Amino acid sequence: MMDTKKKPLWILLASALAVGMAGCSGDDGKDGADGAPGTPGEDGQPGTSGLHIDMAEEAVAQISGASYAGGTITLEFDLANRQGVGLFGLSGENPDHDFRFSLAQLQQEEGSELKQWFSLLNETTNEAGTTFEQGFEKLKDCPECLTDHGDGTYTYTFKTDLSGYEDAAGVVFDEALTQRIAIEMQFEYASGHELAENAHYDWIPATNAQQGIGTRDLVTLETCYTCHQSDSLKAHGGRRLDMENCQSCHNGVVSDPNGVSVELGHMIHAIHMGPSRVGLDDTGTEVPMPYTVEGYHGPHAFDYPAFPTKPFMDCTVCHVADENLADGELWMANANGNACTGCHTDRPVQHGSFTVPEGMSCTDCHGSVDHTQSRAPYEAAKGYSVEVFNVMVTPENLLTFDVEVLDDQGNAVTEEEIYQQGYSNPYMVVSWDVEKDYPAQEVLSDDGTTTIGTTYDHRRFSLKGDGSSVYDNGVFHVTTSKVKSGKTYVMDLPADIAIRTLEILPVLKVCFEPHSAVRTDCTSEGAYPAYVQTPGYRTILGDTDATVAQRRAIVDDGKCFGCHSMEFYHDSNGVNCIACHTNDKTLKSDSASGGLKSTSFMYKAHKAQGHDNGHGGSGTLLKTDCTTCHSATEGWGGMDYGFALGRNAGQAHALPAKIGDPDAATWYASSDTAACMSCHQKYLSDAAMAHIRGNGGYFGAVKADAKAAQEACATCHSPQKVMGHHGHEL
């Protein structure tokens, strides 16, 4: 029988291969000729170099050049991180990439020599089409306008054809005038990370060059930083950072929908007037007129800013002389009436019933006014001195001393030329233990008619009016006992005062003619008082040759004067507030919380209006940055910081036991604990307070226990870590 079983496939293939090989001679013939070369392929895309912009911690923008041809502007710019590494990947198709371009030109106002920036690409802001704001070319509206060169350099071509462009506000592009291109970027990622940057480029399109450009540089942003900080000046959600970008947008053509000018000069003057901005209404009645503009959520009134500088009308606070400012003196040489109305409103109180005729400006009548002279009395007072001599302790344990006020020529100032009105008394404040934060506020006895103690009421004596002083031929003879509101206050002088540091601090004003350095009687019409800036008298009575110990460095006085200028809120002679506002000074009512608050210098510095406008910071100061006010000096082992903890053991700081309670008891905190509580008391949890107490801090009703506390805060909370906790670095 025939076997019909199928053989495996591999056996069949092997058999076929064997037959094929048997038919080969072993020679495969000559190699064929080489084929013709193939057609070269297209070049590949260049690779990127640098860092993708979405991976960057920060971005620095710089416009490297611009050109104009046929009505179109082409812009070259770079993006890099702070190390100079190029940032590629900017794209109008990326929803996180909010990137904008604006244009403005510098031109003279019609009928005026005043040169002003006028924005282009303007948009209307009301239905009538009569008010305008600066418009932008947004990258997301024209992604194809951008070329990314892959290395952090970019080219952007404006889509607007300026040769036939009709601006909504009627501004006519002139290629022969100075133009400003500005960049605004603000990337806000879902992670919370943000990139924000500005850049600008001034040039003349007709020549495609920067030679011969016009300027309008009146102030520097660094001057603003004297009071403000960079983060507090980030406008419009952090998009606007540079002065040049502010100028481009807040220019001579823009206003809110109601026609209120938001031109930079007008706006800045008006905002800083705050609640002091007043004018006349239609009936001729003086009324508050805080600067009010229509915003995204309705009208916004700037009735809260507190301009801290004295004298108030000292223009040089902002218009600081700076050789790098091309137009630093323009504000005097060519005053802008729009800036005038920023302070004085369109209906100045000083005008009364007078109405400015059509076509006239402020400078037509007031062109010769020199506001720089408003500081003349203060400048003069800086040259005055207060001499203290014949300091003695009486058998009754009172201190007596003589005081003479001298001008810069050594001439005595008379009693009639020394100012006294309201809270302004010509005080001599007596203190001891200066290096230990001044005397504690204690009342030894009070029988209703006489009180003996060391409170600031017991330690300050007026040269006029409280019975402590006798004036004789230019010299005031002072005894440390006075009468106030019918009660006699006697200072309790320490028995060992001869070996303690003694300070007698003069806090007084001298009267001058208005806007003048000429001294005058304080009853004269328009007499202007200015504080004498003179060092306090310090000594050790038992050893007048000894070196008098100083209070540790805490605050940088220069920063205080930089913002406040010649005068603080009151009683101003240097940064000596603690002479009265000691750590344990009595509490007072607090309208903000409805309860009580501390009145110590530390608390006031941390929480004063303008220093603190809410938890976590303020609109003026970045309060979380301790270096805003505190000192930093070179020490043996590096920098010594004025906010370092652990330097002031033995003190008791008065605080309310509970925030918001008008009947709260006075409790006391140890020094480092008080520093934290001056800002954070309202927000301290039980766990946080337990942590403080667990590390030696004290907060309770017993003053002696606060003084005896042995705090260990500084062990962990170094200045570097304190700054880190608040989001900053040293």
Q: Which role does the model predict for each range below?
A:
Residues G50-Y68, Q373-E396:
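Low-complexity, acidic Ser/Thr/Pro/Gly-rich terminal tails and inter-domain linkers that flank the onset
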Residues A33-H52, V349-A380:
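A eukaryote-biased signal for short, well-structured alpha-helical docking elements
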Residues K234-G237, D256-G259, L325-L330, Q350-T355, ...:
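Short Cys/His-rich "knuckle" micro-motifs
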Residues E57, Y68-V320, L398-A664:
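Extended surface/linker regions that mediate inter-domain or inter-protein docking
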